[in-house]
Regions:
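Residue at a conserved register position within TPR or TPR-like alpha-solenoid repeats
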Residues: 75-77, 116, 156, 195, ...
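TPR/Sel1-like alpha-solenoid repeat signature
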Residues: 109-116, 128, 148-156, 195, ...
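Alpha-solenoid helical repeat architecture
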Residues: 1, 13-29, 38-46, 54-71, ...
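Helix-turn-helix DNA-binding segment
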Residues: 301-350
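TPR/TPR-like (Sel1-like) alpha-helical repeat modules
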Residues: 4-12, 243-259, 294
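Intrinsically disordered or compositionally simple regulatory linkers and C-terminal tails
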Residues: 280-310
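Alpha-helical adaptor scaffolds
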Residues: 183-205, 209-212
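Helix-turn-helix repeat elements of alpha-solenoid scaffolds
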Residues: 1-13, 23-52, 76-92, 118-131, ...
Length: 350
């Protein structure tokens, strides 16, 4: 909290000049962009109120919209409803576009898309990203496309558009575990998700493995949560030991920062593992987490689930029952909601 005001004074007195930089590294995130700001999120309100002005003054164009977006993303990761915050930020998009940077535009649109996805509005999330992609294409900002396309792939995985996800995997996934490029880590994680969804857990483990040392050395807490959850999923799918250790590591880190959506975004994929795991370090946080995980599972019951063989796709009735099961409804409750007989529901569930 003392560094930013000090730099502000130096800049004001023209004693130092800042070189250009990217707060996001072309990622759709400020909290987990060029730097991991998880430690800051523990005091997000205090920091916002005390250094918002100096940050914007110090960073110039790079600071336009940054404090508000960073605070909103911190609250989002903690499971809060950020609809009101997003309305305020979106109302200033013209100012951001004219006076800020495309990095911040992507961070804001990325956060909007993630909040839409978390609210069960997957198609809205896809439209948000596609709209920005079209604008960036007109402005020649193609450097954002690799991570933007990876984000679209993640949305496709949530909404069951597996053919589109596979198309991204074939044409755009890095698929080179030997030569790690940490700037592509968002794409590596997306690649691992597709591999898990396609029933290739061993390939996912190969994709994820090189990221471990970098994430640990550089203190990438959010990336670490994703790494451990995806590793746990891949190990569990391959019926290997050790998934409990990785999931415990992810929960320990998430609980430290009070993060909810970093874990709950995996919804129906991680739900059975969470129900099996004995973890009781913070009951209140765990209850909040499980509620959000079940909500995501209900919105996207096929996320990262093995692809069904041709001819075995779920019927609309089966999809509705799966949706309600993920919402933690009992067979009797499902029967009442669907105006069906209990034995009929039990037949579908079995």
């Amino acid at each position: 909290t003392e560094t930013i005001p000090a730099v502000f004074r130096l800049l004001t007195n023209k004693e130092v000049a800042l070189p250009p930089f990217s707060a996001t590294s072309t990622l759709p995130s400020l909290m987990n962009g060029g730097k991991d700001f998880s430690p800051w999120s523990k005091k997000d309100d205090l920091l916002y109120n005390t250094i918002r002005g100096p940050v914007m003054a110090v960073l110039g164009r790079d600071g336009v919209g940054l404090p508000d977006c960073a605070l909103a993303e911190s609250k989002f990761e903690k499971g809060e409803n950020i609809s009101g915050r997003m309305l305020t930020i979106i109302s200033r998009m013209s100012e951001l576009r004219n006076n800020g940077t495309p990095d911040m535009e992507f961070a804001v649109s990325g956060l909007l898309a993630r909040s839409q996805l978390a609210g069960g509005r997957g198609e809205d999330a896809r439209r948000t990203v596609l709209a920005l992609r079209e604008q960036f294409e007109e402005r020649g900002l193609t450097r954002f496309f690799p991570n933007m396309d990876a984000m679209l792939c993640r949305i496709d995985l949530h909404t069951g558009q597996l053919d589109r996800a596979d198309e991204w995997y074939r044409a755009k996934a890095p698929r080179d575990p030997i030569h790690l490029n940490v700037m592509k880590r968002y794409q590596y994680f997306t690649q691992a998700m597709v591999e898990i969804a396609d029933g290739q857990p061993d390939a996912a483990l190969m994709t994820l493995s090189p990221l471990g040392p970098y994430i640990k050395t550089c203190g990438r807490y959010i990336d670490g949560i994703h790494l451990h959850i995806l590793t746990a999923l891949a190990l569990h799918r391959s019926k290997a030991e050790g998934w409990q250790t990785h999931l415990t590591e992810a929960l320990d880190t998430a609980a430290e920062f009070r993060f909810i959506r970093t874990v709950s975004v995996y919804g129906t994929a991680v739900l059975p593992l969470l129900e099996k795991l004995e973890w009781s370090k913070d009951a209140k946080w765990k209850n909040q987490l499980m509620a959000d995980v079940r909500a995501q599972a209900a919105y996207y019951p096929l996320f990262l689930q093995p692809r069904l063989p041709p001819g075995e796709e779920l019927t609309p009735t089966e999809r509705q029952i799966l949706y309600l099961l993920c919402a933690d409804k009992s067979n009797a409750e499902i029967a009442r909601i669907m105006d069906s007989k209990l034995p009929t529901v039990k037949t579908h569930v079995s």
